[in-house]
UniProtKB/Swiss-Prot annotation:
GO MF annotation list: 4 iron, 4 sulfur cluster binding; iron ion binding; NADH dehydrogenase (ubiquinone) activity; NADH:ubiquinone reductase (non-electrogenic) activity; quinone binding
Broad enzyme group: translocase
Protein name: NADH-quinone oxidoreductase subunit B
Residue sites binding [4Fe-4S] cluster per the record: 37-38, 102, 132
Pfam family, one: Oxidored_q6
Entry keywords, A to Z: 4Fe-4S, Cell inner membrane, Cell membrane, Iron, Iron-sulfur, Membrane, Metal-binding, NAD, Quinone, Translocase, Transport, Ubiquinone
CC terms in the record's Gene Ontology section: plasma membrane; respiratory chain complex I
Organism, as annotated: Bordetella avium (strain 197N)
InterPro entries: NADH_UbQ_OxRdtase-like_20kDa, NADH_UQ_OxRdtase_20Kd_su
Cofactor dependency: [4Fe-4S] cluster
Enzyme Commission number, as recorded: 7.1.1.-
Localization annotation: Cell inner membrane
Subunit and interaction comment: NDH-1 is composed of 14 different subunits. Subunits NuoB, C, D, E, F, and G constitute the peripheral sector of the complex.
Amino acid sequence: MAIDGILKQGFITTSADKFINWAKTGSMWPMTFGLACCAVEMMHAGAARYDLDQFGIIFRPSPRQSDLMIVAGTLCNKMGPALRKVYDQMPEPRWVVSMGSCANGGGYYHYSYSVVRGCDRIVPVDVYVPGCPPTAEALVYGLLQMQNKIRLTNTIAR
């Protein structure tokens, strides 16, 4: 958090935008939308070795409790409406991370008749994590980039 000034009385001065965004980055609660092998790497990133809890990232089972969705794997045409429905159930503000080549653009199954060529055709995506499947380190890096993006947004409308 960018601190504008520290007064001698023990007060810290900063803008409301910076404070609110700092609080949001320290408490991102993702909902997993694992569709294929990328979900295994997503579970690996949530295990003890990478410990996403240290970044304030705690996986939630319900879309109503989460503010971040991680779409991991091949998205089929039949799964598209379900993805949109789950996204619409999330409270505002909400963000989406697309994990893996299949979620980013169809991947290996790009030319199949039943595969959506990128989950950004269904929901707006904020961060893309490349790879087939991406490593747990790549997902952690993508989540840190998501935190940086949240820090730079304007929370209070001007």
